[in-house]
Amino acid sequence: MAHTELIIIDNYDSFTYNLVQLFSTFGIKIQVFRNDRIGIDDIPDNSYICISPGPKSPRDAGISKAVIERFYTKVPILGVCLGMQAINEVFGGKTQRAPIPVHGKRCTVTHNNESIFKGIPSPFKAARYHSLCCSPVACPLKVLATGPDGVVMAIRHPVYPLFGVQFHPESFLSEYGEVIIRNFLSYA
């Protein structure tokens, strides 16, 4: 890992500190900033970045979209739930109501065995807590995983280490969360 620090943009979500706990198992220094309490110039360009889950929609996620726009070509970024929706919107995709809201449910995720899913069986079980989803996914983003209802569960940029997951790898209901984070941290 060339990067030794992680910046988490907290979108006022109760799962943010579950992400902190999961990332901390890798010995990385972590700083958490609320989405309206940090300026874009305060974020170092040599850190990993995680855009946390949160209530509402990406338009209510403070600095999150600006952080993605500024840093996606420079550092690895992982967006979780709302963070994935923000990534999609940065590239022109839309966020809409999910066909059926899914809150606190363990569902199967089917993936293509690449990048952040290396070494993880497909399908696997993951926790979902969302009423919104990415539809459509913006070009050039690539769909990596889907749920049984067809909702996109993971995306990535084809060139840069920019990833989004709709599910919650940090939840105790999710399998392989630690592997997903390790795979993300392997991008330096």
Regions found by a protein language model. Give the residues of each.
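Short hydrophobic/Thr-rich beta-strand motif most characteristic of the beta2 strand and flanking loop
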Residues: 29-35
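Short, charged N-terminal beta->alpha structural module
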Residues: 5-26
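Catalytic beta-strand/loop cores that center a nucleophilic Ser/Cys/Thr
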Residues: 115-159
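Phosphate-binding/catalytic loops
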Residues: 123, 164-175
